[in-house]
Amino acid sequence: MELNKDPGRLRNYKLLNNVYGSSKSEIEKNLTTINTKYGNIIFNKCNNAAENLKKALDEVWIASCDDAKINNFVMPISGTYNYRVIQDTGMLSPHSYGIAIDLNRNDADYWKWVPREKGDSRIAIYPKVIVESFEKYGFVWGGKWSHFDILHFEYKPEIIIKAQHFFEDDKNEAWDYNIPKDDKNIEIINLINEKIN
Protein backbone atom coordinates (compact mmCIF):
# COMPACT_ATOMS: atom_id res chain seq x y z
CA MET A 1 0.00 0.00 0.00
CA GLU A 2 1.22 3.45 -0.90
CA LEU A 3 2.13 5.84 1.92
CA ASN A 4 -0.37 8.60 2.67
CA LYS A 5 -2.85 7.42 0.03
CA ASP A 6 -6.33 6.82 1.39
CA PRO A 7 -8.67 6.56 -1.63
CA GLY A 8 -12.26 6.98 -0.53
CA ARG A 9 -11.41 7.64 3.13
CA LEU A 10 -12.20 11.37 2.97
CA ARG A 11 -15.75 12.06 4.09
CA ASN A 12 -18.05 14.90 3.11
CA TYR A 13 -20.24 15.33 6.17
CA LYS A 14 -22.61 17.73 4.43
CA LEU A 15 -23.29 14.99 1.87
CA LEU A 16 -23.62 12.28 4.54
CA ASN A 17 -26.03 14.42 6.58
CA ASN A 18 -28.08 15.24 3.48
CA VAL A 19 -28.35 11.64 2.25
CA TYR A 20 -28.38 9.46 5.39
CA GLY A 21 -29.63 11.74 8.18
CA SER A 22 -28.29 14.74 10.07
CA SER A 23 -28.96 13.61 13.64
CA LYS A 24 -28.98 10.36 15.58
CA SER A 25 -32.79 10.26 15.59
CA GLU A 26 -33.00 11.04 11.87
CA ILE A 27 -30.44 8.36 11.03
CA GLU A 28 -32.18 5.79 13.22
CA LYS A 29 -35.45 6.40 11.33
CA ASN A 30 -33.54 5.44 8.16
CA LEU A 31 -32.19 2.16 9.54
CA THR A 32 -33.56 -1.17 8.41
CA THR A 33 -32.71 -4.80 9.12
CA ILE A 34 -31.63 -7.00 6.25
CA ASN A 35 -31.66 -10.79 6.43
CA THR A 36 -28.49 -12.40 5.09
CA LYS A 37 -26.79 -15.79 5.29
CA TYR A 38 -24.50 -14.07 7.80
CA GLY A 39 -27.41 -13.10 10.05
CA ASN A 40 -29.62 -10.04 10.46
CA ILE A 41 -27.79 -6.77 9.88
CA ILE A 42 -28.88 -3.20 10.63
CA PHE A 43 -27.98 -0.72 7.89
CA ASN A 44 -29.20 2.58 6.43
CA LYS A 45 -31.88 2.10 3.75
CA CYS A 46 -31.28 5.48 2.05
CA ASN A 47 -29.49 5.60 -1.31
CA ASN A 48 -30.03 1.81 -1.60
CA ALA A 49 -27.29 1.20 0.98
CA ALA A 50 -28.98 -1.72 2.78
CA GLU A 51 -30.12 -3.27 -0.49
CA ASN A 52 -26.59 -3.11 -1.91
CA LEU A 53 -25.05 -4.50 1.28
CA LYS A 54 -27.35 -7.50 0.99
CA LYS A 55 -26.34 -8.00 -2.66
CA ALA A 56 -22.64 -7.83 -1.78
CA LEU A 57 -22.99 -10.29 1.10
CA ASP A 58 -25.13 -12.65 -1.01
CA GLU A 59 -22.43 -12.64 -3.68
CA VAL A 60 -19.71 -13.34 -1.10
CA TRP A 61 -21.81 -16.19 0.32
CA ILE A 62 -22.14 -17.78 -3.11
CA ALA A 63 -18.36 -17.53 -3.61
CA SER A 64 -17.83 -19.13 -0.20
CA CYS A 65 -19.63 -22.25 -1.42
CA ASP A 66 -16.56 -22.93 -3.59
CA ASP A 67 -14.04 -21.71 -1.00
CA ALA A 68 -15.15 -22.09 2.61
CA LYS A 69 -12.09 -20.12 3.85
CA ILE A 70 -13.77 -16.94 2.59
CA ASN A 71 -16.20 -17.02 5.50
CA ASN A 72 -13.28 -16.88 7.96
CA PHE A 73 -12.78 -13.30 6.77
CA VAL A 74 -16.48 -12.43 7.06
CA MET A 75 -17.87 -14.12 10.18
CA PRO A 76 -18.58 -13.14 12.79
CA ILE A 77 -19.41 -9.67 11.56
CA SER A 78 -17.85 -7.14 13.94
CA GLY A 79 -20.38 -4.34 13.52
CA THR A 80 -22.43 -1.95 11.45
CA TYR A 81 -24.51 0.86 12.98
CA ASN A 82 -22.90 2.44 16.03
CA TYR A 83 -23.48 6.15 16.64
CA ARG A 84 -20.03 7.31 17.76
CA VAL A 85 -17.20 9.74 17.14
CA ILE A 86 -13.90 8.57 15.60
CA GLN A 87 -11.27 8.57 18.33
CA ASP A 88 -9.07 11.70 18.44
CA THR A 89 -10.99 13.42 15.60
CA GLY A 90 -14.28 14.77 16.93
CA MET A 91 -15.86 13.58 13.64
CA LEU A 92 -18.71 11.09 13.33
CA SER A 93 -17.76 7.60 12.21
CA PRO A 94 -19.43 6.32 9.03
CA HIS A 95 -20.83 3.64 11.35
CA SER A 96 -22.86 6.49 12.90
CA TYR A 97 -24.69 6.83 9.60
CA GLY A 98 -25.30 3.09 9.29
CA ILE A 99 -23.28 2.93 6.04
CA ALA A 100 -20.21 0.97 7.18
CA ILE A 101 -19.65 -2.66 8.04
CA ASP A 102 -16.71 -4.26 9.79
CA LEU A 103 -16.29 -7.90 8.89
CA ASN A 104 -14.49 -10.50 11.03
CA ARG A 105 -11.75 -8.85 13.08
CA ASN A 106 -8.09 -9.87 12.97
CA ASP A 107 -5.36 -8.32 15.13
CA ALA A 108 -3.55 -7.19 11.96
CA ASP A 109 -6.53 -5.30 10.51
CA TYR A 110 -5.92 -1.75 11.71
CA TRP A 111 -3.03 0.66 11.16
CA LYS A 112 -2.92 1.74 14.81
CA TRP A 113 -2.64 -1.87 16.04
CA VAL A 114 0.26 -3.23 13.97
CA PRO A 115 3.23 -2.17 11.85
CA ARG A 116 2.60 -1.60 8.15
CA GLU A 117 4.33 -4.89 7.21
CA LYS A 118 1.79 -6.94 9.18
CA GLY A 119 -1.04 -5.03 7.54
CA ASP A 120 0.52 -5.67 4.12
CA SER A 121 0.75 -9.41 4.90
CA ARG A 122 -2.91 -9.50 5.90
CA ILE A 123 -3.96 -7.61 2.77
CA ALA A 124 -1.98 -10.05 0.60
CA ILE A 125 -4.11 -12.99 1.79
CA TYR A 126 -7.45 -11.16 1.91
CA PRO A 127 -9.88 -12.80 -0.57
CA LYS A 128 -10.22 -10.61 -3.65
CA VAL A 129 -13.76 -11.85 -4.17
CA ILE A 130 -14.86 -10.07 -0.99
CA VAL A 131 -13.36 -6.77 -2.10
CA GLU A 132 -14.66 -7.11 -5.67
CA SER A 133 -18.18 -7.98 -4.50
CA PHE A 134 -18.35 -5.02 -2.16
CA GLU A 135 -16.91 -2.60 -4.72
CA LYS A 136 -19.37 -3.85 -7.32
CA TYR A 137 -22.18 -2.67 -5.05
CA GLY A 138 -20.73 0.73 -4.13
CA PHE A 139 -18.46 0.09 -1.15
CA VAL A 140 -14.89 1.28 -0.64
CA TRP A 141 -12.48 -1.00 1.21
CA GLY A 142 -10.32 0.19 4.09
CA GLY A 143 -7.62 -2.24 2.95
CA LYS A 144 -6.77 0.18 0.13
CA TRP A 145 -5.87 2.95 2.56
CA SER A 146 -2.35 3.59 3.84
CA HIS A 147 -4.13 4.13 7.17
CA PHE A 148 -5.48 0.64 6.63
CA ASP A 149 -8.70 -0.65 8.17
CA ILE A 150 -8.87 -4.06 6.53
CA LEU A 151 -12.12 -5.31 8.07
CA HIS A 152 -13.94 -2.07 7.07
CA PHE A 153 -16.22 -1.54 4.05
CA GLU A 154 -17.98 1.80 3.65
CA TYR A 155 -20.89 2.55 1.32
CA LYS A 156 -19.77 5.36 -1.00
CA PRO A 157 -21.24 4.65 -4.42
CA GLU A 158 -20.40 8.17 -5.59
CA ILE A 159 -16.67 7.43 -5.18
CA ILE A 160 -16.92 4.08 -6.98
CA ILE A 161 -18.90 5.60 -9.87
CA LYS A 162 -16.44 8.45 -10.26
CA ALA A 163 -13.41 6.13 -10.00
CA GLN A 164 -14.83 3.79 -12.66
CA HIS A 165 -15.32 6.73 -14.97
CA PHE A 166 -11.67 7.72 -14.77
CA PHE A 167 -10.51 4.19 -15.58
CA GLU A 168 -12.74 3.73 -18.62
CA ASP A 169 -11.32 4.22 -22.10
CA ASP A 170 -14.03 6.65 -23.19
CA LYS A 171 -14.03 9.66 -20.91
CA ASN A 172 -16.21 11.84 -23.13
CA GLU A 173 -19.24 11.45 -20.89
CA ALA A 174 -19.52 13.15 -17.52
CA TRP A 175 -18.93 10.70 -14.65
CA ASP A 176 -22.57 11.05 -13.60
CA TYR A 177 -24.08 10.54 -17.08
CA ASN A 178 -26.16 7.49 -16.12
CA ILE A 179 -27.55 8.87 -12.84
CA PRO A 180 -31.16 10.12 -12.98
CA LYS A 181 -31.16 13.93 -12.78
CA ASP A 182 -33.84 14.67 -10.21
CA ASP A 183 -33.37 17.62 -7.83
CA LYS A 184 -31.94 15.50 -4.99
CA ASN A 185 -29.40 13.75 -7.25
CA ILE A 186 -28.31 17.03 -8.85
CA GLU A 187 -27.70 18.51 -5.40
CA ILE A 188 -25.63 15.46 -4.40
CA ILE A 189 -23.68 15.43 -7.69
CA ASN A 190 -22.82 19.11 -7.18
CA LEU A 191 -21.61 18.39 -3.63
CA ILE A 192 -19.43 15.53 -4.89
CA ASN A 193 -17.95 17.60 -7.69
CA GLU A 194 -17.26 20.46 -5.30
CA LYS A 195 -15.34 18.23 -2.87
CA ILE A 196 -13.52 15.95 -5.31
CA ASN A 197 -12.51 18.38 -8.06
Residue map of PLM features:
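Low-complexity, Gly/Ser/Thr/Pro-rich intrinsically disordered linker/tail segments
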Residues: 136, 149-197
